Amino acid sequence: MKVVVFAYHDIGCTGIEALLEAGYEIQAVFTHADDPGENRFFGSVAQLCAEHNLPVYSPEDVNHPLWIERIRELAPQALFSFYYRNMLKQAILDIPTVGAFNLHGSLLPAYRGRAPINWCLVNGEAETGITLHQMTAKPDAGAIVAQQAVTIADDDTALTLHGKVRLAARALLEQELPKLRAGDIRLTPQDESKASYYGRRTPADGELHWHRPARELHNLVRAVTQPYPGAFSFAGDRKLTVWKSHWLAQQSDKQPGTILSQEPLRIACGEGVLEIVAGQAEGGLYVRGAQLARELGLVEGMKIGAKASNALRKARLTRVLILGVNGFIGNHLTERLLQDGGYEVYGLDIGSSAVDRFIGHPNFHFVEGDISIHTEWIEYHIKKCDVILPLVAIATPIEYTRNPLRVFELDFEENLKIVRYCVKYHKRIIFPSTSEVYGMCDDHSFDEDSSRLIVGPINKQRWIYSVSKQLLDRVIWAYGKKEGLNFTLFRPFNWMGPRLDSLDSARIGSSRAITQLILNLVDGTPIQLVDGGAQKRCFTDIEDGIEALFRIIENKENRCDGQIINIGNPDNEASIQQMAEILLAKFEAHPLRDHFPPFAGFKLVESKSFYGDGYQDVSHRRPSIANARRLLDWEPTIEMEETIGNTLDFFLQGAVTTGVEHD
């Protein structure tokens, strides 16, 4: 059987060796170039390929059309991925005739994602394993071919557990590869209800937070000990790395992080005590815990913890300027930032109905105003604040055809001023791009870094919003490249939830789809399905969206700098008609149903009669969220039906309270 292999790490070497022994014909191997900044403790796929005279490549982008075509020309019957670090696009997965298969270091569906071995140890698991499964566009979600369990011992570290998993992988492949070659393959779908997803780990994730239980901290130590960067804490500003530890169940009345004894070196935790068996001071040697204490001058009663200079810096709250704070995203984001306690929010908008509940909060400062008029106030606050979010825009489809020039003036021209102020004062801008920039893209899912942005002809005015946003994206990107602007672009995909638009805005046609449909139910008018409602969208709960946006603001390890990030839920894909049917069912079952008129039925309307001349629709809009998973460790969790129910309840409660309901 002819195969193409994507491989890295020891598991990659193991997979290639197993394929050769099973009689597979490896036509090409794709791997990664060694990272000089990485502690490479594992075998080299490139060296192994050289020893076996196998062609090996390390392309910058294996999903580039040129590489896809080269792989297609090889006509492989199967693809195998063994710890290859990049996602393969559907165009590659569709090439082999037998299928594409991945070897994942956990017992799927648990621990999908990155660094599963480290995460299992962090979480104190007693068992993990290895899974051979079909590859799909969604990471680690394909049907299972075979699995082999691995027991995790109390003294296992990431290195020893990796060795166990490698041996299990070898045994599993020796058993399954001959079957697969003979066509004897049995697939078991994954149970999505048991799925869990974990993102990549960074060295910063190794910080020891002493208020946690000692057992958790011990698990962290063994999860990231050598050859990984290690768990760490600080004595003042001096870093100490913990390479080996024990945990004790004994309790202490001392504050977490307090030194209880020097020899042995024991630290009070939120629950129990952690004993540092071996460690290393920054710039020092690997030594026993007692010697480490002496080198750092640690004595009983002292405290260790966060870096002292960082703690002083964090005493000042991060100042966030939100223009359009009263809008759907703005008011929900304000709530999340104030709940966190580490942020001071400055907001401007032409109204305050959605943020009145924050007035009086010591960390919320609101001014009523228009961004096209209050330019001096805006420039001053951009200079004053740390993070800028210009959320002001016209984002309702009917306005794209009804008021195209106003859309351009506000969405592009006014926001360009904000961008230039951020350049002038060297401020970080988090700019709301839009899923609309993808236009009529023909990809199965829209990728921030490779999908084409396809729009219609000039006489279709509805694209003025899309191209205004796209042009700003390009301007921001250029400022980042040429003048060092610190930016992140985020692209929301059909966020829904309470406080989305208003029924009044729906009455004049200036609202999103679900608000318009709810108005039809409240008023007892037919639900209008534009062009039959066949258009598909991926609906995202506002809570999921705001959590992702909050993590962009947090920007751990500066991961989001210079990035474009889709924020959507690809699993919540449905047509407008399907959404309307779910909405109707929830409306009929709602406790307030009797306050409103009978359902008036569905009415099919043409887009031209609803939106006017110049409208053109999009058949589907499905995001790739690989960037969000990788950069934010984020995964949407809320199903569409729950979101629809919450949105409906908000509007019905409001209608009853204000007396809008049917008499």
UniProtKB/Swiss-Prot annotation:
CDD domains: Arna_FMT_C, Arna_like_SDR_e. Pfam families: Epimerase (PF01370), Formyl_trans_C (PF02911), Formyl_trans_N (PF00551). Its EC number is 2.1.2.13, 1.1.1.305. One of its GO terms (cellular component) is membrane. InterPro entries: Arna-like_SDR_e, Bifun_polymyxin_resist_ArnA, Epimerase_deHydtase, Formyl_trans_C, Formyl_transf_N, Formyl_transf_N_sf, Formyl_transferase-like_C_sf, Lipid_A_modif_metabolic_enz. The record marks 140 as: Raises pKa of active site His. The record marks 102 as: Transition state stabilizer. (6R)-10-formyltetrahydrofolate binds at residues 114, 136-140. SUPFAM superfamilies: FMT C-terminal domain-like, Formyltransferase, NAD(P)-binding Rossmann-fold domains. Keywords: Antibiotic resistance, Lipid A biosynthesis, Lipid biosynthesis, Lipid metabolism, Lipopolysaccharide biosynthesis, Multifunctional enzyme, NAD, Oxidoreductase, Transferase. Residues 316-663 are annotated as: Dehydrogenase ArnADH. In the N-terminal section; belongs to the Fmt family. UDP-L-Ara4N formyltransferase subfamily. This is Bifunctional polymyxin resistance protein ArnA. It comes from Aeromonas hydrophila subsp. hydrophila (strain ATCC 7966 / DSM 30187 / BCRC 13018 / CCUG 14551 / JCM 1027 / KCTC 2358 / NCIMB 9240 / NCTC 8049). The gene is arnA.
